Design a protein with these regions (language model features):
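Hydrophobic/aromatic residues positioned on beta-strands within the core alpha/beta folds
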Residues: 218-220
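Short amphipathic alpha-helix used as the core "switch/output" element in two-component signaling
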Residues: 200-213
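Acidic, metal-coordinating helix/loop segments flanking the phosphotransfer/catalytic sites
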Residues: 165-187
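Charged docking surfaces used in two-component/phosphorelay signaling
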Residues: 150-157, 170
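Receiver (REC) domain active-site loop signature in two-component systems and cognate sites
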Residues: 14, 194
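Acidic catalytic/metal-coordinating carboxylates
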Residues: 168, 198-201
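Alpha4 helix (beta4-alpha4-beta5 surface) of REC/receiver domains from two-component response regulators
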Residues: 201, 223-242, 247
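Flexible, small-/acidic-enriched active-site or ligand-binding loops
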Residues: 1-6, 57-94
Length: 265
């Protein structure tokens, strides 16, 4: 059966992409007049091009991630499972919600979600071998999407790895500040776009701190442009992994293992 969130397909420069009814996902129905005036935003998430129908674009603003706040109890009729962060529009008290796009894609395209979570569950069947040097230490990750948190936890569970997740980069950095040393941490995964502290801030602060500067950092993000990859690697990240690629995550863990935790014979 067709997913009611998917309106159909459009062709853009020879590429066919699905169009998602964003207001419907949020629980709103556009009137005929609104639909007539609506527009489609085309976006690229991890090399997946999608169209999102919206009633109107009020404007575009560039924000520093310190201006982005985690979701909280808004005391109003809003599905907080869809809202992961918020901010305020420039020079106003207008609240602007930031949506969990990964959750949107999973719900709008369940076949893609099934493949993603099936790949996480099948990790154990592939017989990957992880050294005790990595297994005995903990992987830390910063990720504001609940759906991706669940996915990453599933991958690490299947590999038999210890891990601890944080809802944003600032919470991760605050946790690192409480540690006397990094002996119990094998590596850090970080998203790029998060409230309070972005992945760029995580890399910058970890590299500036003598305690954490030698800890491996893997950027795990939907923002998979060449510019983003080049920028974070230049900042000192070890690897850049686009969401969602289970085999690449495992391969990257192995690369970290070989470089930082070589086994002696």
């Amino acid at each position: 059966d067709a997913n009611p969130l998917i309106e159909g397909m459009i062709e853009l420069r020879g590429v066919y992409l699905p169009v998602i009814d964003l207001p419907k996902w949020m629980g709103f129905e556009m009137s005929d007049e609104e639909r007539e005036k609506s527009i489609i935003i085309v976006s690229d998430f991890s090399h997946n091009f999608i169209g999102m129908r919206v009633a109107h674009i009020h404007g575009v603003e560039e924000k520093n991630w310190t201006d982005i706040k985690p979701a909280s109890n808004y005391n109003m009729n809003v599905n907080t499972n869809q809202v992961i962060n918020h901010t305020y529009l420039e020079n106003s008290d207008t609240l602007c919600f930031i949506l969990d796009i990964e959750k949107l894609l999973i719900e709008a395209m369940p076949s893609m979600a099934e493949k993603i979570f099936a790949s996480a569950k099948s990790v154990v069947d592939k017989g990957y071998q992880i050294s005790d040097a990595v297994k005995n230490r903990k992987i830390l990750f910063a990720e504001d999407s609940r759906a991706i948190q669940q996915y990453m936890g599933m991958v690490f569970d299947q590999l038999g790895l210890r891990y601890q997740g944080f809802d944003n980069g600032r919470l991760l950095l605050n946790y690192l500040d409480t540690l006397d040393n990094m002996d119990d941490v094998s590596m850090v995964f970080t998203d790029l776009e998060m409230p309070e502290a972005s992945g760029h801030t995580v890399i910058k602060e970890m590299k500036a701190n003598p305690k954490t500067r030698n800890t491996p950092i893997i950027v795990h993000t939907s923002m998979t442009s060449d510019n983003n990859s080049r920028e974070v690697l230049d900042m000192g990240a070890d690897h850049f992994v686009g969401k969602v690629d289970t085999d690449l995550i495992v391969a990257t863990i192995h690369k970290i293992e070989e470089k930082y935790y070589p086994q002696t014979v």
